[in-house]
Curated annotation (Swiss-Prot):
One of its GO terms (cellular component) is extracellular region. InterPro entries: Cerato-ulmin_hydrophobin (IPR010636), Hydrophobin_sf (IPR036686). It comes from the Eukaryota. Belongs to the cerato-ulmin hydrophobin family. Its main location: secreted. SUPFAM superfamilies: Hydrophobin II, HfbII. It comes from Trichoderma asperellum (strain ATCC 204424 / CBS 433.97 / NBRC 101777). Induction: Expression is up-regulated in the presence of root and stem powder of Shanxin poplar and under nitrogen starvation, but not under carbon starvation conditions. It is found in: Secreted; Secreted, Cell wall. Pfam families: Hydrophobin_2. The keyword Transport does not apply. This is Class II hydrophobin 1. Residues 1-15 form the signal peptide. The gene is HFB2-1. Disulfide bonds join C19-C69, C29-C59, C30-C42, C70-C81.
Length: 88
């Protein structure tokens, strides 16, 4: 029984997203982030992004871009972006 409960908690910990739910829920790889207000040259990462260190690696491999969690992306630009959980 203890193993079962520990497994449930471990599974839940693995499912935590690097981007918060709600407003900043869109993971993006961006070329420039201007004071967290505007991000330029953004696109959705080509690979799944769990955990945060993997998100950094994926964006870095895609042209040295910065991983960000943003509001709704429009035409390669995002407004209001924050750093993802688990990144430097």
């Amino acid at each position: 029984m203890k193993f079962f409960i520990a497994t449930i908690f471990a599974t839940g910990a693995l499912a935590i997203s690097v981007c918060p739910t709600g407003l900043y829920s869109n993971p993006q790889c961006c070329g420039a982030n201007i004071l967290g207000v505007a991000a330029l040259d953004c696109h959705t990462p080509r690979a799944p992004i769990l955990p945060g260190a993997l998100f950094e690696a994926v964006c870095s491999d895609e042209g040295g871009k910065e991983p960000l969690c943003c509001t709704i992306p429009v035409a390669g630009q995002d407004l209001l972006c924050v750093a993802p959980v688990g990144t430097a």
